[in-house]
Amino acid sequence: MSYYGSSYRIVNVDSKYPGYPPEHAIAEKRRARRRLLHKDGSCNVYFKHIFGEWGSYMVDIFTTLVDTKWRHMFVIFSLSYILSWLIFGSIFWLIAFHHGDLLSDPDITPCVDNVHSFTAAFLFSLETQTTIGYGYRCVTEECSVAVLTVILQSILSCIINTFIIGAALAKMATARKRAQTIRFSYFALIGMRDGKLCLMWRIGDFRPNHVVEGTVRAQLLRYSEDSEGRMTMAFKDLKLVNDQIILVTPVTIVHEIDHESPLYALDRKAVAKDNFEILVTFIYTGDSTGTSHQSRSSYIPREILWGHRFHDVLEVKRKYYKVNCLQFEGSVEVYAPFCSAKQLDWKDQQLNNLEKTSPARGSCNSDTNTRRRSFSAVAVVSSCENPEETVLSPQDECKEMPYQKALLTLNRISMESQM
């Protein structure tokens, strides 16, 4: 069982790398990395000692109610009604007490009929705000203060209903629930694609009503620590091949690791040891509501598999296309050099220069059949891992011409065979 579990068995083509290097696990234990984004898209950020925290929440009370949790929402919903009933019930009881209605004197016309205790005043307040109207208790024309209190309670009840019910409906229709149906692959992969080293991950929408259009964005967040122990974070955008997508079927997002990529100089070992996080966001519009949504996820080095590619999930049938969701997370090991994209470009440039200079050295062609050697992908990998090689003399270079030609041919065939 490998470091990533039994579902992702690691197989390399070079015997000196029997599995993922142990420094991958050692580096992970050495540093307790805390990610900025969890896999579900929630931010791992805690704010403390915010200036004017409660004041800012109360100014935008509607957004505060929408963002709060459902259990807190239920408590606020219940307390808003119960407290308003108690407050206005107390006011009606004070009016009755001041007017002498609690004495039950038949010569006194009460402000509110049949209110002779606090319980009766509370029930009258509840009936007024909820417009139940049993008819046993009612306000009279004797006290203008009681009439004004009924008017204020009716207005306040409309305001409470607007905020509480509106916030509850907005919370149920929030975009976060729709974002949970957008799924990112748990692992990101690095492998060869069209002859280039690429970083890939997969996005899928598993609802019947698919998104209309969407934009994918990726950023590399690198953590660094200065001499004083202060942590700094630097963001850099990753250029994507397919950033504008229609998510009808699962799509593999591709980032070519070229000279503009922050991963350009990182080989397999460097990726395992580095301290970075890849933040991916998907902003899209739903076809059922027409509202904008956003889904997020992230990948850290231990969630990046080197030398893998995703399984195909799309099957072509006679009348429709079939998506096999069981293969969404599946990947298979493929050939990928252990060196960085920078070293690959350097080696490709050297081989291209060798091809250009080979016609001018016809004396070397007569010696092509004298030396026959077997080549494998290990030779390509080994040559990529040592970009700084000694310069050969013209005589030795002529002798190595068959080897270099075979190496060039094998390198291109190996890359094309993965497509």
UniProtKB/Swiss-Prot annotation:
Keywords: Cell membrane, Ion channel, Ion transport, Membrane, Phosphoprotein, Potassium, Potassium transport, Transmembrane, Transmembrane helix, Transport, Voltage-gated channel. One of its GO terms (molecular function) is inward rectifier potassium channel activity. It comes from the Eukaryota. Residues 95-117, 135-143 are extracellular. One of its GO terms (cellular component) is basolateral plasma membrane. It catalyses: K(+)(in) = K(+)(out). The modification Phosphoserine is found at residues 358, 374, 376. It is a multi-pass membrane protein. InterPro entries: Ig_E-set, IRK_C, K_chnl_inward-rec_Kir, K_chnl_inward-rec_Kir5, K_chnl_inward-rec_Kir_cyto, Kir_TM. Abundantly expressed in the proximal and distal segments of the nephron. Its main location: membrane. The keyword NADP does not apply. The record marks 161 as: Role in the control of polyamine-mediated channel gating and in the blocking by intracellular magnesium. Residues 118-134 dip into the membrane without crossing it. It is found in: Membrane; Basolateral cell membrane. A motif (Selectivity filter) lies at residues 131-136. The chain crosses the membrane at residues 68-94, 144-171. It forms heteromeric channels with Kir4.1/KCNJ10; this interaction is required for KCNJ16 localization to the basolateral membrane in kidney cells. As a heteromer with KCNJ10, may interact with MAGI1; this interaction may facilitate KCNJ10/KCNJ16 potassium channel expression at the basolateral membrane in kidney cells. May form heteromers with Kir2.1/KCNJ2. Can form heteromeric channels with Kir4.2/KCNJ15. Belongs to the inward rectifier-type potassium channel (TC 1.A.2.1) family. KCNJ16 subfamily. Inward rectifier potassium channels are characterized by a greater tendency to allow potassium to flow into the cell rather than out of it. Their voltage dependence is regulated by the concentration of extracellular potassium; as external potassium is raised, the voltage range of the channel opening shifts to more positive voltages. The inward rectification is mainly due to the blockage of outward current by internal magnesium. KCNJ16 may be involved in the regulation of fluid and pH balance. This is Inward rectifier potassium channel 16.
